[in-house]
């Protein structure tokens, strides 16, 4: 396919036009008085959102250069969302301000590479200042505040704070759609995985259709169990102990399954068979997690253990296991705390080294099952459009709260960025590097300016007023008053603010150092075909 090429100022201005169109659509959502944006969907109802990354993803421009510019800024929003779960609009506003100021200097003859170095040094200094300012999250109320700001709803913030309080910072908090109005929080103690009993005959409570085993032995096998002869020696030993048995295996079928069911119905022996969770290598890993949690071993021929030779000391145990048709919950496994902690550290290391978002998510789930617990927030709404929007807001707020726990909190509302610009007095830069640093200094005003504008105030006046206030004091855009931001609960996670600035600077540096843009040549639309039918249809003969 033919390409078109633009150079120098033409190339950079084309990219800037695309960036401005995207940023202008996104920045109207910033702050407590930010507006919503309606996104048309080809199928179904339109989506209404104030989430920066969702809006950015929808924007596709026609002009090839503008399209590339918009795609670069999308990357800022997406990267910030991936790392911190929030701050996408702030990142977009910062990128727009940095690029605008940087391109003005490039057009005036500044060296783009020196500007880039100046921007990088300035951002490094501001990031360090933000982390220095950050206060550790010590109370449930602080978590509720940061989540409430992200979700623009105090009820959601309080529910997330309660969920984090129960499952810990390593715990998993998932959001599900509910058939009822309002919000519900469902907590799971212990480890839960999404496989239930193989046969309904295993249920001990027929009304609730669930099986409950108290102080059971737990057999964990990485293979199918079909031959009852393999299982009999172990069954006899377990029966002599008088305890129930939970079997977790790839599958239990044939004679082995029917023997277990018959003994359960007759009341001779209480047991439940459950399929192992996951597939392939993930299944092996999850069985290993269950073994460590319950103090057992995975019986697998890979490690030289055969089912027919298994002894009671290879079995795990727990205080209680509850099994429904869809899921199994192991409460209070008998594994050693040191071994569980070792496994947790191993999974953490795997998360850090993983390149795949999907793998990271699955590892995070495994970590939560071992280290914390699982909390499910069920969200309901009057319409499907509102439900989708609400669910998305809650998911963002959960990640925001976790980011706050990780690196602490700073004053929100664009105040931390503006007041961090004091570090520029200590930066000893000269020439175009100093010009690059100055571009960052000006860009740090942009989020606060935009929040003020969205609140119907004069941006420049607000910036000057906040610049002269005590550190940590700023504008509460919801009321128009100047307050102590942290005391009022107007806070942002330091990780969100830092990531937004670093990602914006990274893309801005690419814009400034671009000297040529190569894009696909737009194809001309084919001429419309002639209408069908015989010629001369209107003529009289």
Swiss-Prot record:
Family: Belongs to the chaperonin (HSP60) family.
Ranges annotated as spanning the membrane: none
The reaction(s) this protein catalyses: ATP + H2O + a folded polypeptide = ADP + phosphate + an unfolded polypeptide
GO cellular component: GroEL-GroES complex
Description of how the protein assembles with itself and partners: Forms a cylinder of 14 subunits composed of two heptameric rings stacked back-to-back. Interacts with the co-chaperonin GroES.
Organism, as annotated: Streptomyces coelicolor (strain ATCC BAA-471 / A3(2) / M145)
A molecular function GO annotation: unfolded protein binding
Protein name: Chaperonin GroEL 2
């Amino acid at each position: 396919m033919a390409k078109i090429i633009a150079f120098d100022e033409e190339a950079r201005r084309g990219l800037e036009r695309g960036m401005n169109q995207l940023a202008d659509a996104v920045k109207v959502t910033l702050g407590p008085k930010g507006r919503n944006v309606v996104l048309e969907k080809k199928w179904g109802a339109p989506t209404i959102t104030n989430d920066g990354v969702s809006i950015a993803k929808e924007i596709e421009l026609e002009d090839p250069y503008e399209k590339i510019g918009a795609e670069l800024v999308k990357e800022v929003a997406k990267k910030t969302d991936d790392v911190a779960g929030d701050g996408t609009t702030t990142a977009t506003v910062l990128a727009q301000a940095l690029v605008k100021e940087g391109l003005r200097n490039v057009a005036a003859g500044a060296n783009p590479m020196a500007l880039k170095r100046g921007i990088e040094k300035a951002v490094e200094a501001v990031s360090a200042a933000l982390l220095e300012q950050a206060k550790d999250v010590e109370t449930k109320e602080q978590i509720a505040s940061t989540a409430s700001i992200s979700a623009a709803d105090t009820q959601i913030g309080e529910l997330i704070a309660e969920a984090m309080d129960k499952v810990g910072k390593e715990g998993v908090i998932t959001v599900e759609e509910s058939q009822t109005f309002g919000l519900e929080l469902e907590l799971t103690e212990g480890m839960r995985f999404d496989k239930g009993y193989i046969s309904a005959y295993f249920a001990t409570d027929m009304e609730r259709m669930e099986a409950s085993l108290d102080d059971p032995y737990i057999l964990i096998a990485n293979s199918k169990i079909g031959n009852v002869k393999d299982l009999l020696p172990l069954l006899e030993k377990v029966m002599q102990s008088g305890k129930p048995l939970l079997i977790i295996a790839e599958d239990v079928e044939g004679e082995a399954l029917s023997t277990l069911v018959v003994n359960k119905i007759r009341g001779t022996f209480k047991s439940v068979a459950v399929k192992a969770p996951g597939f392939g290598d993930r299944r092996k890993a999850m069985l290993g997690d269950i073994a460590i949690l319950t103090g057992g071993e995975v019986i697998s021929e890979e490690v030289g253990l055969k089912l027919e030779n298994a002894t009671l000391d290879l079995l795990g145990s727990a205080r209680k296991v509850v099994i429904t048709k869809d899921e199994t919950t192991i409460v209070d496994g008998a594994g050693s705390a040191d071994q569980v902690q070792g496994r947790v550290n191993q999974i953490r290391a795997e998360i850090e080294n993983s390149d795949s978002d999907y793998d990271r998510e699955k590892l995070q789930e495994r970590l939560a099952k071992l280290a914390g617990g699982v909390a499910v927030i069920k969200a309901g709404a009057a319409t499907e459009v509102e439900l989708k929007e609400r669910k998305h807001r809650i998911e963002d707020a959960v990640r925001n709260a976790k980011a706050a726990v990780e690196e602490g909190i700073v004053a929100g509302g664009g105040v931390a960025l503006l007041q961090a610009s004091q570090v520029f007095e200590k930066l000893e830069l000269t020439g175009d590097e100093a010009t690059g640093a100055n571009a960052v200094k000006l860009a740090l005003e942009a989020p606060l300016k935009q929040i003020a504008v969205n609140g119907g105030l004069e941006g420049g006046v607000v910036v000057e007023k906040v610049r002269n206030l005590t550190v940590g004091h700023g504008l509460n855009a919801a009321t128009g008053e100047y307050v102590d931001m942290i005391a009022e609960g107007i806070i942002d996670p330091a990780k969100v603010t830092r990531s937004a600035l670093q990602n914006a600077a990274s893309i801005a540096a690419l814009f400034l150092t671009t000297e040529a843009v190569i894009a696909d040549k737009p194809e001309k639309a084919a001429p419309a075909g002639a209408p069908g039918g015989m010629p001369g249809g209107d003529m009289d003969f």
